[in-house]
Amino acid sequence: MALVLFSRNFIKHPRMLGSLIPSSRFLVNRLLDQVDWGRAGTIVEYGPGVGTFTGEILRRLPPEGNLVAIDTNRDFARYLTRTLRDDRLHVIEGSAADAGESLQERGLGRADYVISGIPYSTMAPELRAQILHTTHDLLQPDGAFLVYQFTRAVLPHLRQVFPHVQQEFEPRN
């Protein structure tokens, strides 16, 4: 069901999704291994889709933690709400550009981590800049923005907003 929903939405909205199929477990593990789960109180996920990362984040997240999953796609938001029943999960149908407000509305303060797979290279430059600046502002001072992409196009934009940017490659994705 998840793969069908994901693929159908890729066909309907190819610029909103970075790939025809969800991320591999290799990418999920590689990215999430960078999280210090002992200090992961609040995590924000942009573009959770069918929950490939979301489910694994919840599996690793401490009992007192919170995960705010933000997706512009109504089908994905509804799917996550139906399939991932967890009190720590807050599914929002909306824009990553409004993530700061979403955290404030839930009394969650700043995020320890923001995880994002939304395709920055296909979005309007103004929206991309707004999302990156919003993300910078909502992170704890020692927080991290973990981005996975299929191209390097977002790197110069990340470097304009974030002081320390590093990249890695996962060949098995």
Q: For the regions a protein language model found, what residue spans apply to each?
A:
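Conserved SAM-binding loop of SAM-dependent methyltransferases across substrates and taxa
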Residues: 50-62
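S-adenosyl-L-methionine
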Residues: 77-105
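Conserved beta-strand signature within the Rossmann-like core of class I S-adenosyl-L-methionine
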Residues: 142-149
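Conserved SAM-binding motif I beta-strand of class I
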Residues: 66-71
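Class I SAM-dependent methyltransferase Rossmann-like catalytic core
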Residues: 3-38
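Conserved class I S-adenosyl-L-methionine
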Residues: 40-49
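A short glycine-rich, Lys/Arg-flanked "PGG" loop and its adjoining helix->strand segment in the class I
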Residues: 129-141
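Class I S-adenosyl-L-methionine
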Residues: 154-173
